[in-house]
Amino acid sequence: MFAVIKTGGKQYRVATNDVITVEKLEAAAGESVTFPVLLLSGETTLVGAPLVEGASVTAEVVEQTRGEKVIAFKKRRRQNSRRKRGHRQDLTVVRITEIATA
């Protein structure tokens, strides 16, 4: 059985015991979080409009981490003008513990 969940403006296909990295969630390591379900596939397939009623996915927060550094470099030729900025996105690693149906 798998489900499609939405968090952080993105959709993820998950199954029980999957470990996924999502945008930062306000939860400490070891806490439980719940996600809404957009699509549920098992013995039958349920498609939500926009969500599947009564279905939810429960996950446990494994850790809070940060992504790889992304460099934004701008240069204006012949003007000795340069700007270099770095960015690291805050991420949360979660383990899917349960997919509950209606």
Curated annotation (Swiss-Prot):
Annotated Pfam families: Ribosomal_L21p (PF00829)
GO cellular component, one term: ribosome
InterPro entries to which the protein is assigned, alphabetical: bL21-like, bL21-like_sf, Ribosomal_bL21
Keywords recorded for this protein, A-Z: Ribonucleoprotein, Ribosomal protein, RNA-binding, rRNA-binding
Keyword RNA-binding assigned: yes
Taxonomy, superkingdom: Bacteria
Record has Hydrolase as a keyword: no
Complex formation: Part of the 50S ribosomal subunit. Contacts protein L20.
Similarity annotation: Belongs to the bacterial ribosomal protein bL21 family.
Official protein name in the record: Large ribosomal subunit protein bL21
Gene, per the UniProt record: rplU
